[in-house]
Amino acid sequence: MPASSHRLDVVLIPVSESRVMTGTPPFTGPELCHLQAHEVIDLLKRGEISPQDCLDAAFTRIDQIEPTINAMPTTCRDRAYAAAASLDVSHHGKAGFLAGLPIAIKDLTPVEGVRTTFGTKAFADFVPAASDPLVARLESRGGIVVGKTNTPEMGAGANTFNAVFGATLNPWDTHLNPGGSSGGAAASLATGEVWLSHGSDHGGSLR
């Protein structure tokens, strides 16, 4: 793809390159953001990093990136750190398959206690009392929700824009939109804000 003068090289994660970590602990936030999900999970399970380390790295990255691309307009820091504190990721612990990995959830899917707008002003201030079963299952397996990713209104759109949060920008070219309806999820992954980001597909969003 030809280079663009509007490409955010400073924030893109080079997905074509190996992200395997070299060296010894402790690992820094910037290093963690360049790892793949399975590599971070392995480090968590070996006790070389903690869920709190991952959250620190993720939120630092989110704070750096979000003013430019608007991929994850809602975060839930207190909830995330509380979840991390409750996990036991020791060798004999029961943190689950994800072992404390930070994840993002598309803003069409309710997360208990976290603003969920569905991308529409009709639900601009909606805070659900219960999580969607998908979220509950991910959390039961050690996933830690850090925020909600942007989506078109009610997921019905080919571009990631809504009247609540505005447009998400494509980190490869900020004159473009990453598309819908999981554009916020895609942009959050491309920029290394999180290692796993939930998306949904009714008419081609993930295809």
Placement of each model-derived feature along the sequence:
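Short glycine/serine-rich loop segments
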Residues: 130-207
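An N-terminal boundary/leader segment
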Residues: 1-76, 81
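Conserved hydrophobic/aromatic pocket- or pore-lining residues that grip, position, or stack substrates
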Residues: 58, 80, 106, 138, ...
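Enzymes and membrane/adaptor proteins characterized by extended Gly/Ser/Thr/Asp/Glu-rich
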Residues: 97-134
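Long amphipathic alpha-helix in the N-terminal Rossmann-like dinucleotide-binding domain
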Residues: 78-85, 142-143, 152
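Glycine-rich, aromatic-flanked loop segments that form ligand/cofactor-binding clefts
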Residues: 90-109, 143, 148-150
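Hydrophobic face of alpha-helices
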Residues: 52-56, 102, 135, 139
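Short alpha-helical functional segments enriched in proximate histidine and acidic residues
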Residues: 61, 65, 83, 87, ...
